[in-house]
């Protein structure tokens, strides 16, 4: 898919389709007024039937509108102008794409970024449009004998002359973001008989070959044993697939000497059966998505490298597979973590935090500016927040505020949960420093509390993406969240870096 910007009058340029908005009660957007004028009142002369009421997400496809060079004109209902917010704007873009897919149109001129969206500029509108368009066109058909093909291959956004420069930058950022999201989706959707910890590492290495300022290394099981990463090792010992922690290091040549890295740690359970505490069989196939934290990190690193952001970012893909077997770890086991703290295993299905606790201790060696871990960690977070927002916890209020701000900017929403000392008591164990679960109540919070015990050396945030990383049902598949949130967070960091230079 190719994206362009143009500030010229597209109504007189040849194309397969132009897309314009109309508001409820027959109010026209500026572009609709233009088309109506060029066509000598053709749009105003259409019957005000149910197809042309301008209600949100209505669509009316017109062919051969008089004096308009495009073969088709697609009218998108925008609802009431004063109610047009970011959520509705994205829905309008999605409606546009889904309608265009059925038309056979190849090259399209789109006027929808002219719409006034509360609190959003042209940069946001074009970036968001690209993200929605690529999501609507995305199809994971790698393992299907018949591939899904769409004719649509070029969209030109029509903007004013003064908006052109910002729009071109937005296209560059939007494409990079869409690529990062799609790479995260592709990795997450890959079946678990193919996507194991070694596959995560191979994918990172192959991708890194495109960039001179990216390098990839790996911590294998032998090195983990030498280091004392016994919690991480325990989780994967029931699987024939070796646990591997892949480390992606991106370092811009534009940063000052002594810059500390931002570290992203992604839970990469390439399949989570639950181990000895085995999961119910229903929907167990979706446990291939337990590596969406690692997929997110991979996607974000794509965005950072594609945009050549002036940052130092390290991404950790904490890969392992949790399987039952004669060598699997058991409820009742006590593990000595890399930090020296001991953990009593009460449930082997609370394995992600065991992998992460050692990974979080490991990254201390990088002397990070901050660390963010991303994990499909708890079903409790899904119960608390549903599938709309990721759970956010942090030991540093400014970091949490920056992430929440980025979530609002991107529309990839998060909600902060508490990390109070009163919750820590639920992790008490009679036999070890802590247990790996904290009982039925506040499960997402106690999981965050567990991780917090391994993050005293740096500013840290935790994103629980169990409810947002993939969809179930008819639209089953990875969402690519929260690549957009974290990419926006890093774009903000890069902007601050430039302004401070």
From Swiss-Prot:
Binding site for Mn(2+) 2: 267, 272, 290, 351
EC category: hydrolase
Cofactor: Mn(2+)
Active site location: 279, 353
Pfam family of the protein (one): Peptidase_M17
BP GO terms, sorted: proteolysis
Substrates-to-products reaction catalysed: Release of an N-terminal amino acid, Xaa-|-Yaa-, in which Xaa is preferably Leu, but may be other amino acids including Pro although not Arg or Lys, and Yaa may be Pro. Amino acid amides and methyl esters are also readily hydrolyzed, but rates on arylamides are exceedingly low; Release of an N-terminal amino acid, preferentially leucine, but not glutamic or aspartic acids
Free-text cofactor note: Binds 2 manganese ions per subunit.
Protein origin, superkingdom: Bacteria
PANTHER family in alphabetical order: CYTOSOL AMINOPEPTIDASE (PTHR11963:SF23), LEUCINE AMINOPEPTIDASE-RELATED (PTHR11963)
Name recorded for this polypeptide: Probable cytosol aminopeptidase
């Amino acid at each position: 898919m190719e994206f362009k910007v143009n500030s010229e009058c597209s109504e007189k340029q040849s194309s397969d389709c132009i897309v314009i908005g109309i508001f409820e009660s027959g109010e026209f957007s500026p572009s609709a007024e233009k088309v109506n004028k060029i066509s000598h009142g053709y749009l105003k002369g259409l019957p005000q039937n149910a197809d042309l009421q301008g209600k949100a997400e209505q669509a009316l496809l017109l062919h051969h509108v008089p004096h308009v060079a495009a073969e088709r004109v697609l009218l998108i209902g925008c609802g009431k102008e004063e109610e047009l917010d970011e959520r509705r704007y994205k829905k309008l873009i999605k409606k546009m794409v889904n309608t265009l897919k059925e038309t056979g149109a190849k090259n399209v001129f789109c006027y929808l970024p002219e719409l006034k969206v509360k609190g959003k500029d042209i940069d946001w509108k074009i970036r968001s449009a690209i993200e929605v368009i690529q999501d609507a066109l995305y199809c994971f058909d790698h393992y299907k004998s018949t591939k899904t093909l769409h004719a649509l291959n070029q969209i030109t956004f029509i903007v004013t002359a003064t908006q052109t420069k910002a729009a071109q930058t937005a296209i560059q950022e939007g494409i990079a973001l869409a690529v990062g999201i799609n790479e995260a989706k592709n990795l997450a959707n890959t079946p678990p008989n193919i996507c194991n910890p070694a596959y995560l590492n191979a994918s990172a290495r192959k991708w890194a070959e495109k960039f001179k300022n990216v390098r990839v290394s790996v911590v294998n099981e032998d090195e983990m044993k030498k280091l004392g990463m016994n919690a991480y090792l325990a989780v994967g010992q029931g699987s024939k697939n070796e646990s591997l922690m892949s480390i992606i290091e991106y370092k811009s040549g534009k940063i000052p000497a002594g810059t500390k890295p931002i570290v992203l740690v992604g839970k990469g359970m390439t399949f989570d059966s639950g181990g000895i505490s085995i999961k119910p069989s229903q929907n167990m196939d979706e446990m291939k998505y337990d590596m969406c934290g690692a997929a997110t990190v991979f996607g974000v690193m794509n965005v950072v490298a594609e945009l050549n952001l002036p940052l130092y970012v390290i991404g950790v893909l904490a890969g392992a597979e949790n399987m039952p077997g004669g060598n699997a770890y058991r409820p009742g086991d006590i593990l000595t973590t890399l930090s020296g703290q001991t953990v009593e295993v009460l449930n082997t299905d609370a394995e992600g935090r065991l992998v992460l606790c050692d990974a979080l201790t490991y990254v201390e060696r990088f002397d990070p500016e901050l660390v963010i871990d991303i994990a499909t960690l708890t079903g409790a977070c899904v119960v608390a927040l549903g599938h709309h927002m990721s759970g956010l916890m942090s030991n540093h209020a400014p970091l949490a505020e920056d992430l929440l701000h980025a979530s609002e900017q991107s529309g990839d929403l998060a909600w902060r949960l508490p990390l109070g000392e009163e919750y820590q008591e639920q992790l008490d164990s009679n036999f070890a420093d802590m247990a790996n679960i904290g009982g039925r109540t506040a499960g997402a919070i106690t999981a965050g509390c567990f991780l917090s015990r391994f993050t005293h050396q740096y500013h840290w945030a935790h994103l629980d993406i169990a409810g947002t990383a993939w969809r179930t049902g008819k639209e089953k598949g990875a969402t690519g969240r929260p690549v957009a949130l974290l990419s926006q967070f890093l774009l903000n960091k890069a902007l601050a870096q430039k302004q401070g230079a």
